[in-house]
Amino acid sequence: MKEQDILENQNWLEVWHHYYDPELELEPNDPNAICISSVDSTGMPNGRYVLLKDVSEKGFLFYTNLKSQKGKELFVAGKGALTWWSRAQNKSVRVQGTVEQVRDDIADTYWASRKEDAKISAILSKQSDEVASREQLEEEFAKLKAEYAGKDIPRPKHWSGV
C-alpha cells in the first residue's frame, strides 16, 4: 500500500493492519503496547500503557481494573484515545472513539486463559492506590495463592475488557 493510498483509505481496520501486522514480526518487545488516554473531571488528560489484546471491526480491546483511575475516567467520559508507536517502522497511529465494556462471557474467556499468578495479581491490585509495602503485598499474594491452590480463580467483577 502506498502512503497516499493509506491516507485516502476509509477502511480503518485495513489501515491498522497495514502498520500493525508487520510490527508483530519486527518488534520482539511488546509490539502490542498502546497508550490509552482519558481525561479526568477537570479535563486534564491522562495517558498510560496497556497491552492490546484484540482488534476487530468492533474496535480495540484491552483488559483492565474498572475501578482504576483509567477505568473510571474512560467510562465517565464514554470515550478515549489510543496511540500506538512502531519502533521498527518509525510510525505512529492515533485512534479516538467511544468506550464500551465487553460482555461478561468475553471477559471470562480471556480470564480463563490467564496464568494463575496474573489472576491473583489482578485480584490484589488496587490500581492508583499506594501500596503499604512490598512485603505486605507479597504476603497477601502468597495467602491468596494458597487459598486458590488447585481451584478455579473467579474473575472479579471490576476486571474486564474495554
Describe every region a protein language model picked out:
Residues 1-162:
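Binding-site signature for planar aromatic cofactors or substrates
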